[in-house]
Amino acid sequence: CSTEILSLSPASLREMALESLPPWPDDMVLSGTNEHGQKILHEGEFVIALYEAMPATIDVAIPYTYDEYVLVLEGSVVLTSTEGVRQEYQTGDQFLVPQGWTGTWEMPGRFRELIIVETDQWEASDSLLAALFASPPKAGSSAPAVLPLLANTLQQAELDSLPPWPEGVVITGTNAHGQKVLHEGQLVSVLYGAEAALLEVGAPFPYDEYVFVVEGEVFLTSKGGSPKTFGVWDSFLVPEVW
C-alpha cells in the first residue's frame, strides 16, 4: 500500500464517482429508494471508503458486526436506536457506530459519508451488507450507543497530559501534549492536542492513522517531498511506515 499522506478533501470526496452496490434486501428498506454505492480509498490496517445512498430509511435489525466511524460529507442522517435514542447528524458532523448497534438510518435526502472500518472485519463481510450476517445479541447485554464526535464539543474537552516527547523529536517549539481516549473497540478514537512545535518523525509510523483537524493547522513534509497543509475541518491519512 502507499506510504504517502492521503489527503481527504471534503470537496473532492463529494464529487468522486462511486461504484454501484447490490440493493439492500427489500425488508431492510422501510421507505425510499433502494440505491447506493461506494468507493474504497484506502485498505491497510483499516479500510477508508466513500458511501452514498439515495433518500431512504434503512432498518438495521441485526446488530452491526463492526465499529464504523462516519464523517458526513453531504446530506443528513437520523439514527434511532432500537431503545428509542434519536440522534441527528448534518454535513461536517462525525460519529462512531459501535459493534452491536441496532436501529434505523433515516436519510431524508441524498446522503454521502466517509467511513472507516477495521480491515479484518471489512474483509469478513466483503461489503456494507455485513450487518446481515451478524449473530444475534447475547441476552442481557447492554445496548451499545452511537458516539457523537462533534467538533465544537471536542474543541472544549479536557485532555490528560502525556509524557514529553523524547529528546531529538522536538526540533523547535514547546514539548507539551495530551490526549483523551473517546472509544476503544475494533477502532480506537482519540482526541489529541499539542502546543506549537515542529516534530521530527524519524522512526516509521507503526500504524495507519486517520486524522480530522478540529483546531489549528498542521504541515506534513515527507522526506524529499513538498509540505502538505491541513486546517480545521480537513482530514487525512498517515499510512503505516510513513
What residue spans do the PLM features occupy?
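Conserved short histidine dyad/triad with adjacent acidic residue
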Residues: 34-35, 44-64, 99, 175-177, ...
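Ligand-binding loop in jelly-roll beta-barrel domains
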Residues: 86, 91, 99-124, 231-232, ...
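A short beta-strand-loop-beta hairpin characteristic of the jelly-roll/cupin
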Residues: 62-91, 202-232
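Threonine-centered tandem repeat motifs in low-complexity domains
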Residues: 12, 31-33, 80, 88, ...
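A short, N-terminal "cap"/entry segment at the start of jelly-roll beta-barrel domains
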Residues: 2-50, 126-190
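Short S/T/G/P-rich N-terminal loop/turn motif that feeds into the first structured element of a domain
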Residues: 56-57, 121, 134, 138-139, ...
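Residue-level recognition of conserved beta-strand positions in structured domain cores
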Residues: 50, 64, 74, 81-82, ...
